[in-house]
Amino acid sequence: MSLFATLKRLLRGKSSQEVELEYLISHGMHLGKNSTINSGCLIDSGWPWLISIGEHVTIAPNVTILAHDASPDVVACGTKLGKVSIGNNVFIGPRAVILCNTRIGDNVVIGAGSVVTHDLPSDGVYAGAPAVRICSIEEYRQKNRCLMETRPYFGDIRRWDDWRESTDEEKELMKRQLEDGCGFI
């Protein structure tokens, strides 16, 4: 089959992100059940077999995951390679960078813009460049449970992914209720 025919078959009805994800998986990347990789993510396509993503993982938009580091090559030392392992029940915030040779445990939240340069143990919330532990996952849960008792809950309006169906009145109500802080869906 010609390259053009192969590309045409691969692209039929699929987004470029779906095609990229299929490529990564077919070349050895592990992606667990119920895991989501949002748009704009850059996952190292040169070394996909070195990357493992667990179950129930959400990777927010524009996250970068690298299994190599070419910076040593600048001083003629070669390119460094290392496995990236992301555990189960993990949220990685937008624009975070996960560098090679890192392991992220289970039940972890990584804040937006964080740079993961070393292993992150399970049951923690991490943020910063480099990422450092902010609190335990249980402290984070408790903080949000307390907030949910006093802040607006929009579950009765629409699910977050159905916002396009919300009426103008529902959108205005949400804006007013969020004037002085956050809410939940």
Which sequence ranges carry the predicted segments?
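Terminal amphipathic alpha-helical/low-complexity segments used for targeting or macromolecular assembly
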Residues: 1-28, 131-185
